[in-house]
Curated annotation (Swiss-Prot):
Stated name of the protein: Phenylalanine ammonia-lyase
Pathway noted in the entry: Phenylpropanoid metabolism; trans-cinnamate biosynthesis; trans-cinnamate from L-phenylalanine: step 1/1
Subcellular location(s) of the protein: Cytoplasm
EC number: 4.3.1.24
Keywords for this protein: Cytoplasm, Lyase, Phenylalanine catabolism, Phenylpropanoid metabolism
Swiss-Prot/TrEMBL catalytic activity: L-phenylalanine = (E)-cinnamate + NH4(+)
Modification comment: Contains an active site 4-methylidene-imidazol-5-one (MIO), which is formed autocatalytically by cyclization and dehydration of residues Ala-Ser-Gly.
Length: 725
């Protein structure tokens, strides 16, 4: 019987052997200090989320993606998927030997009579069957997996988007380059050529459960490579190509491939379609997360919010890094903002004009967004690990001369990450809708007109009322999409695939969520720009009203009928306080109307002064009551003309007071929307609808044009909150 000490010695020896073996295997990297990869995962999360997004954007714009199997990023996948700036794919020559070795091992193993899954056996629940016709087996694999429906001749489109297909091709190449899959390097080169020539195989939209990988859609890439008659592709201009035409256009100077043992399985048994689409989704999700932080800050500006909600101590005491960063980003935008300075003065004039604290959609936006940023960031890292993983079965370990039968094809990281991301997107959308609802509601928006209407006649301008209804629709659909996909697993393939990830389905639903959040973001930003312009108009109109009231007060209240100084001259200061405190859009359509608050409160000032005028009121020459009618008549004569003059000057681009936004850190986004996209102030007098303007921004957002102005808003941020003073 073996002694305990002997057993320990033996185990230590075996452990040392395994580590030495791993170090000597060129295809494997073992970190003795971090054998479970938790350290690597934690290291990847260092630094700010914004810096990571900036790196993503920079990487997205590089002209070449060099594949080696282990360094692919989601931004590179997104770049190849979009192919909007001609980015090309290069394969690392250093990977050729490893790929070749695993391919040769499969052939040698079969020639020796070794029994290997998918090489000499059937597939899945029927793997008990055996054959020596390895090539024919691969051919049959592709045939029976071509089970997708495209809906040709119907109105429905059941073809996977080209972007997702291109992403899948790139990810599958990257996986196979690691040399554990038993496939010829020439096949990987052949998949690369259509990517570089924008020739895209047609894959079915549905039909995969992403375990055992994305079998059905990936089989159509294999079908094109093998020249199956049902294979189709799209050319650069969208033209439909058969397999031969696709080969010619892609520059594949070879006949269709006759797949060797294991090669068909290597092509189809992976998670590339789900993880490819997930990469595209997460690139956009990271941009939208930063955008939501900046839009929350702009919302605070136009709502005359109190900036203390971003104070670093508050968020430091909560400890969550996403929250701390979200608050710091908002703090940076608001620091030095002209809107914040003006709001501070306003709050000092009348502390009771608005609640002591802003509502939750403004005040708790960092606490709301922070965890969502963390979820999106963690999901990004999870998918980045997945697209650099070897995820087929069996795996060929040439160094140990064996095929490993496992389950890396299980795409659970995709399904879970996409479900979590979709939930985060829905929560961002909910915050955005709450902010939008406050912005258009004159009970909550601190003086902006109802529905953000900008016309002279508000009874014929309902502004963003339709947009608010649309936002409710978007938000409802987005929240419905937040329901998890991964809880709907069905047992498949004769109960062999009895648990499966549904990774691609979840990625597809998250892609839908991205689109809806982009609709919401574009609508919200157009509304914020409207609010910015209304604040500018408000300031100019108030200035005109204030000057006119001052002018009329001096003219009518300073002197008595006999040329003596009149007691009513002391009313001017209080009259101007009324103008300062009263919301312009509450009266500006008819500024002298006796039913509107301005006229009522101006009169009240004169009445109050008259009541304390004492005995002087009994004298006609010194009576303030006697001046009220004169003051009001003069104001009615002058004020409407001056208000119209101020509005006309504003509309012609020559306002007396410049727009505060010009000196704010949020200006690049405003400038992009107004100048680059050519949008303007929406009014009922104008034929342009809100949807037309939102459409311009949505299209630009889908093309990535919002990224530069967004990052420009944060260009001066040093990655840290302001010091606690």
């Amino acid at each position: 019987m073996e002694t305990i000490s002997a057993a320990i010695t033996k185990n230590n020896a075996n452990e040392s052997f395994c580590l030495i073996h791993a170090k000597n295997n060129n295809n494997m990297k073992v970190n003795e200090a971090d054998p479970l990869n938790w350290g690597v995962a934690a290291e990847a999360m260092k630094g700010s989320h914004l810096d990571e997004v900036k790196r993503m954007v920079a990487e997205y714009r590089k002209p070449v993606v060099r594949l080696g199997g282990e360094t692919l990023t989601i931004s590179q996948v997104a770049a190849i998927a979009a192919h909007d700036h001609g980015v090309q794919v290069d394969l690392s020559e250093s990977a050729r030997d490893g790929v070749k070795a695993s391919s040769e091992w499969v052939m040698e193993s079969m020639n020796k009579g070794t029994d290997s899954y998918g090489v000499t056996t059937g597939f899945g629940a029927t793997s008990h069957s055996r054959t020596k016709q390895g090539g024919a087996l691969q051919k049959e694999l592709i045939r029976f997996l071509n089970a997708g429906i495209f809906g040709n001749g119907t109105e429905s489109n059941h073809t996977l988007p080209k972007t997702a297909t291109r992403a899948a091709m790139l990810v599958r190449i990257n996986t196979l380059l690691q040399g554990y899959s038993g496939i010829d390097f020439e096949i990987l080169e052949a998949i690369t050529k259509p990517l570089n020539k924008t020739v895209t195989p047609c894959l079915p939209l549905r039909g995969t459960i992403t375990a055992s990988g994305d079998l059905v859609p990936l089989s159509y890439i294999a079908g094109l490579l093998t020249g199956r008659p049902n294979s189709k592709a799209h050319g650069p201009s969208g033209e439909v190509l058969n397999a031969k035409e696709a080969f010619n256009l892609a520059g594949i100077n070879a006949e269709f491939f006759e797949l060797q043992p294991k090669e068909g399985l290597a092509l189809v048994n992976g998670t590339a379609v789900g993880s490819g689409l997930a990469s595209i989704v997460l690139f956009e999700a990271n941009i939208l997360a930063v955008l939501s932080e900046v839009l929350s800050a702009i919302f605070a500006e136009v709502m005359q919010g109190k900036p203390e909600f971003t104070d670093h101590l508050t968020h430091k005491l909560k400890h969550h890094p996403g929250q701390i960063e979200a608050a710091a980003i908002m703090e940076h935008i608001l620091d030095g903002s002209s809107y914040v300075k003006a709001a501070k003065k306003l709050h000092e004039i009348d502390p009771l004009q608005k609640p002591k604290q802003d509502r939750y959609a403004l005040r708790t936006s960092p606490q709301w967004l922070g965890p969502l940023v963390e979820v999106i960031r963690f999901s990004t890292k999870s998918i980045e690990r997945e697209i650099n993983s070897v995820n087929d079965n069996p795996l060929i370990d040439v160094s140990r001369n064996k095929a490993l039968h496992g389950g890396n094809f299980q795409g659970t990281p995709i399904g879970v990450s996409m479900d979590n991301t979709r939930l985060a997107l829905a929560s961002i959308g909910k915050l955005m809708f709450a902010q939008f609802s406050e912005l258009v509601n004159d009970f909550y928006n601190n003086g902006l007109p109802s529905n953000l209407s900008a016309s002279r006649n508000p009874s014929l301008d309902y502004g963003f009322k339709g947009a608010e209804i649309a936002m409710a629709s978007y938000c409802s659909e987005l929240q419905y999409l937040a329901n998890p996909v991964t809880t709907h697993v069905q047992s498949a393939e004769q109960h062999n695939q009895d648990v499966n990830s549904l990774g691609l389905i979840s990625a597809r639903k998250t892609n839908e969520a991205i689109e809806i959040l982009q609709l919401m973001s574009s609508t919200f930003l157009i509304a914020l720009c409207q609010a910015i312009d209304l604040r500018h108009l408000e300031e100019n109109l108030k200035n005109s009203v204030k000057n006119t009231v001052s002018q009329v007060a001096k003219k009518t209240l300073t002197m008595g009928v006999n040329g003596e100084l009149h007691p009513s001259r002391f009313c001017e200061k209080d009259l101007l306080k009324v103008v300062d405190r009263e919301h312009v859009f509450a009266y500006i359509d008819d500024p002298c109307s006796a039913t509107y608050p301005l006229s009522q409160k101006l009169r009240q000032v004169l009445v109050d002064h008259a009541l304390v005028n004492g005995e002087s009121e009994k004298n006609f020459n010194t009576s303030i009551f006697q001046k009220i009618a004169t003051f009001e008549e003069e104001l009615k004569t002058l004020l409407p003309k001056e208000v119209e003059s101020a509005r006309t000057a504003y509309e012609s681009g020559n306002p007396t007071i410049p727009n505060k936004i010009n000196g704010c850190r949020s200006y690049p986004l405003y400038k992009f929307v107004r100048e680059e996209l050519g949008t303007g102030l929406l009014t009922g007098e104008n034929v342009i609808s809100p949807g037309e303007e939102c459409d311009k921004l949505f299209s630009a957002m889908c093309q990535g044009k919002i990224i530069d102005p967004l990052l420009e808003c944060l260009g001066e941020w040093n990655g840290a909150p302001l010091p606690i003073c």
